[in-house]
Amino acid sequence: MSDIALSISMLSLVAVLGLWLGNWRVYGVGLGIGGVLFGGIIVGHFAGLSGLALDEQTLHFIQEFGLILFVYTIGIQVGPGFFSSLRSSGLKLNGFAALLVLLGCAVAAALHQLFDVPLPVILGVFSGAVTNTPSLGAGQQILAELGAAPGSTGLMGMGYAVAYPFGICGILLTMWLIRMFFRIKIDEEAAQFEQQAGKTKESLQTINIAVRNPNIHGLMLSEIPSLDEADVICSRLKRGDELMVPRPDSRIELGDLLHLVGERHALRKVLLVLGEEVETSLSTRGTDLRVERVVVTNEQVLGKKIRDLDIKQKYDVVISRLNRAGIELVPTSQTSLQFGDILNLVGRLDAIEAVTNVVGNVQQKLQQVQMLPVFIGIGLGVLLGSIPFYLPGFPAALKLGLAGGPLVVALILSRIGSIGKLYWFMPPSANLALREIGIVLFLAVVGFKSGAGFIDTLINGDGPAWMMYGVAITLIPLLVVGVLARLYGKMNYLTLCGLLAGSMTDPPALAFANGMHPTSGASALSYATVYPLVMFLRIISPQLLAILLWAGA
């Protein structure tokens, strides 16, 4: 059997064993995708005993490519809501994340001083305890720059391997402990997040208004200031017994009934200008008007503004709502269309069919993955992650790495939506499949590599002490920040789980958190919100620790 065939066969065995272990549940809690790590340790241990060795280059490629797939698909998933989340809660989330990193550094420095732990060992344990591979690389590089002994990098690697498994388990344990201590109900937390995110009760509102203001009489719809604003849409007009679709040049008369769509505060402002709210129904039922939902799939309209399509004038159809990535938006004339946008159309059936032909509404396209943008995004992400950033006073350059680069690029591209005929939309099922494959590959290799020397390190020498140092570095910051964020920050539990996973740059923990409520994007959103800053801090922190502790030695 060739080296590549043997490597793939062994990793498949690791995945099967690990996923089986992950399905075991104790009191309703299981390892989930994290079981693959322990499947890898078990298989790696017995492979080491039998003298079986896999090709290092193949393993390294599979590990890194799996990680790239995982973080890229996470970025594509949360990108549309990432920047709005950053504006609304980014400061709070990143503040807690920075505190967690700072506490971890403080615990590591204290252990080094109190127990006289060698600097390479504590740096390796620190990197493993926070499950951050770039941190390990940065630490090894700074030790070489400082002139440490040649065996220092090996010591760091051993410390990393010993601390890494509990680094993952510690996050899962912290999530479980917080859930038990605060008696949290997952479904209630998910519903609360949806409400706060504006996806349920706080979504767009509708109101029927009777025109009572004589100053409005005779004005065209486009001449009424309150209706010309970007946050209110007039989708229906009833005059007497006739229900019609209003056009910008439609003249308003006293007694007209208008059906408006918008945010609650905007509708209240319009109500004060136009007249009074009425209970009269403006339903299209029994009339020649229809309300239909169509999906934007036509590549020709991607990136175009609604005003450029001139739908109101050409087809006498109003777009009353726009749903993008589960969030309802007011479809203004300045809104650019993206692939997968869901439009609410109001108009006559033949006119709606004409607009449908313009925007696409081909359901099969929603199940297809455009592969060219995927590899463009991954390639750009790898390039960004490889760019060195030089800071004054640091002997080594800083990089986002293969985990940070693809994530940042995916966030930006999914927010842009489309460029020409290229669109960064991925069906949820395809996104989930690629994400799960990526994290399984990554964990399988990490576990397999750690398995060979794992038991020996634990049983002989200082292995148990190193593991306890790792436990302290993992648990103390997580528990302190977790309790503070929940108790004083009043943070949603699913958001908190994403914060903890992101603060430890731990994809398996995010996969575990996502599994608690698969339909909620709360954990992934907070993970992506803190990840860029945390990755930067995780790369800097071992270098700062090395410089400070080396100087104090």
Swiss-Prot record:
Family annotation (HAMAP family): YidE
Gene Ontology annotations of biological process type: potassium ion transport
Lineage, top ranks: Bacteria, Pseudomonadati, Pseudomonadota, Gammaproteobacteria, Aeromonadales
Gene3D superfamilies: Regulator of K+ conductance, C-terminal domain
Annotated RCK C-terminal domain residues: 191-276, 279-361
Pfam families, per the entry: Asp-Al_Ex, TrkA_C
Family recorded in the similarity comment: Belongs to the AAE transporter (TC 2.A.81) family. YidE subfamily.
Residues spanning the membrane: 4-24, 29-49, 65-85, 95-115, 158-178, 371-391, 403-425, 439-459, 465-485, 493-513, 533-553
Keyword field contains Transport: yes
GO molecular function: monoatomic cation transmembrane transporter activity
A single GO cellular-component term on record: plasma membrane
Name of the protein: Putative transport protein AHA_3492
Compartmental location: Cell membrane
Membrane topology note: Multi-pass membrane protein
Record keywords: Cell membrane, Membrane, Repeat, Transmembrane, Transmembrane helix, Transport
